[in-house]
Design a protein with these regions (language model features):
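Catalytic phosphate/metal-binding cores of nucleic-acid and nucleotide-processing enzymes, i.e., regions
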Residues: 1-76
């Protein structure tokens, strides 16, 4: 899996799926309470105090790219 985040603390992965989002969060040590389950916009937020740490493990892209990943791969 490849992880992507932006400077607004949004976090997704490819291949994109709810199951993979949860696996990614577990791998990065992010609690499930940071998951946003709004249909068609599912993603994790990065806890502010861990932003730099998590960014070092991801490809940092702009917010439009995060939305593109979600939109192209979301079942809803």
């Amino acid at each position: 899996m490849k992880y992507y985040c932006d400077n607004e603390r949004h976090l997704v992965c490819i291949p994109y799926s709810i199951e993979n989002l949860h696996k990614m969060a577990e791998d990065l040590g992010i609690k499930r309470c940071w998951f946003h389950n709004k249909k068609g916009k599912e993603h994790y937020d990065i806890p502010k105090k861990r932003l730099k740490e998590i960014q070092s493990k991801c490809e940092v892209v702009d917010g439009r790219e995060i939305l593109k990943i979600i939109k192209q791969n979301s079942p809803g």
